[in-house]
A protein has these predicted regions:
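Bacterial N-terminal signal peptides
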Residues: 10-19
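Catalytic domains of lipid- and phosphate-ester/thioester hydrolases
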Residues: 4-5, 20-475
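Bacterial N-terminal signal peptides that target proteins for export
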Residues: 1-9
Length: 475
């Protein structure tokens, strides 16, 4: 009898032992860099036919709220066609060149990059209307998974990545993403050691002497959405210094002078921070958390690129975007501001409430500043062009004035797709109450999708774009 009664315990312990063998995926090392291969913006240019317009979508963080809202933007662009003066119809969705994604927005960005139009067949059922949060919690609470969670380097985020892979990405890696012909997808996480923004693209992985192509998309999404404390950091290996990496030629002007060119000062600081990865012996591991910690809008890379573009124009150097006439940026911000009644009570809010608010407020303020910086850049370029084209200005008379007014010719369109742009105050109130989680009611998902399309069509900046290109909208 004693033998029979102990059998379940033996089986249970055996299963625990089997499950304790989980180890985190290791990004492979490369011995030599080839800048003409791998998943990077430069190699994706072969699929671009329209060099006059650069269309960028920036998807913010915010759990399923962000994933659904950004998906609504894709749906709207899918069903919106611009009809040019010649009668040719252009689907806005096909004009997208770059999508940046943070946290919840990274899922929609990566999934669209992988599946293209097929995403519209089942994204709702596979992800948006699924209790992803509950599935993660269920596995964490399953005793069979505890040994894996206790093992070195394999935490809750690795378990979440496995779930993301099962329900959405089907084992796809960046090599699979690179085989597609869609827009360049750049999702970001945050290096918790120094606070740097780390994008999942081969140009950055060159510094690590690592092959991004072997990295599962699910791990990139897990890193980008690894909310501190709630989920564990995602660890990647750094082999920097072992593959003869050198800085790209275009960065040399920024490092040859001790006085950083003003427009690109922030971008240069970011480049310097990334250069720190070249010493893999000193920093063999990089621990990544939610991308929203460093850039919740996915706009930092866009702003850096514009600043560098402006700096190149200042020094009279050519850039890959010199042919661009328009830079069109959809800032898809799912930030919600749930109302509180704290100020109506003498008793202060609890510790947990204060902690959540204290971490969110700086991120929200930084997001606001990022949008304003973009608008400042847009206004500055326009002002310099107007001065340069003014009858009062004579080119060649004053070299200093020529240099100051040497602004990029491209017109920037900053289309703000955020809850605050909704004219329906009742709908705004509803969306602002939605939590940041990976489980929302189906009704909430549908209303988020519908709101995104409505905001775009009613946007004054979108109407300006439509008028400037002389196109009409067909839905």
């Amino acid at each position: 009898m004693r033998t029979c009664s102990s059998r379940p315990l033996v089986v249970f312990v055996s299963l625990l032992a089997l499950n304790s063998c989980d180890t985190r995926p290791v990004n492979p090392k490369i011995d030599q860099i080839d800048t003409h291969t791998g998943y990077r913006f430069e190699t994706r240019q072969v699929y671009r036919e329209d060099h006059e317009n650069l269309v960028i979508l920036a998807f913010s963080g915010g759990g399923t709220r962000a994933a659904a809202f950004s998906y609504g933007v894709l749906e709207s662009l899918r069903h919106t066609q611009l009809v040019g003066p010649g009668g040719n119809k252009i689907r806005l969705l096909d004009e997208i060149d770059v999508i940046t994604g943070i946290s919840g927005g990274s899922f929609t960005a990566l999934a669209y990059g992988l599946y293209g139009d097929k995403l519209f067949d089942d994204y709702e059922q596979r992800f948006l209307k699924r209790n992803v949060q509950g599935e993660i919690f269920g596995r964490v609470m399953n005793p069979l998974n505890w040994p894996a969670l206790w093992s070195r380097g394999w935490g809750r985020s690795e378990m979440a990545a496995r779930i993301y892979d099962e329900i959405l990405f089907n084992g796809a890696t960046y090599a699979d993403l690179n085989r597609g012909t869609g827009p360049f997808i750049n999702v970001s996480a945050t290096d918790i050691t120094n606070g740097s923004r780390m994008g999942f693209n081969q140009s950055l992985f060159d510094i690590l002497c690592s092959d991004l192509g072997a990295v599962p998309l699910s791990r990139a999404a897990a890193a980008s959405s690894a909310v501190p404390v709630v989920l564990s950091p995602v660890t990647i290996n750094n082999y920097g210094g072992t593959c003869n990496y050198t800085r790209p030629e275009w960065t040399q002007p920024f490092f040859e002078s001790s006085d950083a060119p003003r427009p690109a000062a922030r971008a240069i600081r970011e480049l310097n921070a990334l250069s720190d990865y070249r010493d893999g012996a000193r920093r063999p591991y990089i621990h990544l958390v939610d991308g929203g910690v460093s850039d919740n809008l996915g706009m930092r890379g866009v702003l850096d690129a514009l600043e560098i573009l402006e700096t190149f124009h200042d020094i009279g150097a050519p850039t890959p975007l010199d042919r661009a006439r328009r830079i069109i940026i959809f800032i898809v911000n799912s930030l919600s501001t749930p109302p509180t009644d704290w100020d109506k009570h003498e008793r202060a809010p609890g510790t947990l409430q204060v902690l959540v608010k204290a971490t969110g407020v700086p991120i929200d303020h930084y997001s606001y500043e990022a949008v304003e910086l973009l608008k400042d850049t847009m206004a500055r370029w326009r002002m310099m062009r107007e001065l340069r084209n003014s009858p009062a200005f004579t080119p060649g008379r004053d070299p200093v004035a020529d240099a100051i007014l040497r602004a990029p010719d491209a017109e920037i369109y900053a289309i703000d797709v955020s809850f605050a742009q909704l004219k329906d105050k009742n709908e705004l109130k509803y969306l602002n109450k939605l939590p940041t989680s990976f489980h929302l009611p189906s009704e909430a998902v549908d209303r988020l999708r519908a709101a995104a399309g409505k905001i775009i069509l009613e946007s004054p900046e979108f109407q300006r774009l439509r008028n400037d290109v002389g196109a009409t909208i067909v839905q």
